[in-house]
């Protein structure tokens, strides 16, 4: 068996992509597109890793005048995913730049 060469940590490259959105299906579809694009160009993938969902609740009065006890609650759930692309090539970076994602997905990329 051939031994794998270990590269020093400074020589390894990694792109970390964090996705955030309110719609879980849209977010999963976007992560699938990113993973498929990266694998097609020959990069190694770690993820998608589901991060904890944050839930923000808002309480409002149902009536503007009376009946303070009558309230209604709304919540916004923010779903998050993490993808690491290990040892990306120039093809990978170009393919990710041309990738179009839906409007409901926020993306942050760290190199």
Curated annotation (Swiss-Prot):
Any one GO MF annotation of this record: tRNA binding
Keywords of the record: Ribonucleoprotein, Ribosomal protein
Top-rank lineage group of the source organism: Bacteria
InterPro entries for the chain: Ribosomal_uS10, Ribosomal_uS10_CS, Ribosomal_uS10_dom, Ribosomal_uS10_dom_sf
Gene name tied to this protein: rpsJ
GO cellular component term, pick one: ribosome
Gene Ontology BP annotations: translation
Assembly and interaction partners: Part of the 30S ribosomal subunit.
Protein name (record): Small ribosomal subunit protein uS10
PROSITE patterns xrefs: RIBOSOMAL_S10 (PS00361)
HAMAP family: Ribosomal_uS10
Function: Involved in the binding of tRNA to the ribosomes.
Family of the protein in this entry: Belongs to the universal ribosomal protein uS10 family.
PANTHER family referenced in this protein's UniProt entry, alphabetically: 30S RIBOSOMAL PROTEIN S10 FAMILY MEMBER
């Amino acid at each position: 068996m051939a031994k794998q060469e270990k590269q020093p940590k400074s020589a390894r490259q990694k792109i970390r992509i964090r996705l955030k959105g309110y719609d879980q299906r849209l977010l999963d579809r976007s992560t699938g597109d990113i993973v498929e694009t990266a694998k097609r160009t020959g990069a190694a993938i770690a993820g998608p890793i589901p991060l904890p969902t944050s839930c923000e609740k808002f309480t409002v009065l149902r009536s503007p005048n009376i009946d303070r006890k009558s309230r209604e609650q709304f919540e916004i759930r923010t779903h998050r995913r993490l993808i690491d692309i290990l040892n990306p090539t120039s093809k990978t970076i170009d393919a990710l730049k041309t990738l179009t994602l839906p409007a409901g997905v926020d993306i942050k990329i760290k190199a």
